[in-house]
Amino acid sequence: MIAKEENKRARLPIDRVSSQDEPAILALNNEHAAELSWLEPERLSFLLGEAFYARRIGALEAFIMTFDQDARYDSPNFLWFRERYPRFVYVDRVVVAGEARGRGHAWRLYEDLFDHVSRAGQTIVTCEVNAEPPNPASDAFHAALGFVEVGDAVIHGGKKAVRYYTRQVAG
């Protein structure tokens, strides 16, 4: 019975983020502000309006937010890719709630994103991973998904170091 329940939870649908999801997304995001960045409600609404792809699993076991090259977004990481690639989809954040970890949600969100990117005629998905402090689990996860490192930077006045990754997707 436990295995069936675990499998059922792992197969929760992937749904588009709606405005009704914003309070829960904001809370989950800000629980992980050290790894991501703190968001205010107005900023989250703006970013979701700019998003190329924003999805959630379940009530909010996990979510992902991405932007294409045309987004009005001032993140130094997004701008790094914009300076180097004419067309791309940038993964801004993927968050999995603590109680939902280990269920494959991040993998499923990325796989669904890759399908969406391909259908949209895009061919490059980009992201960054913190290098300082190091995040070897995220490095390994992105390598397993087929991402390759293409650069690095020190940002926010030297407070943070990141590695930049890309993954080719058949368009």
Give the location of each predicted region.
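Conserved beta-hairpin
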Residues: 51-68
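A short, internal acetyl-CoA/4′-phosphopantetheine-binding micro-motif in the GNAT/acyltransferase core
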Residues: 92-102, 130-131
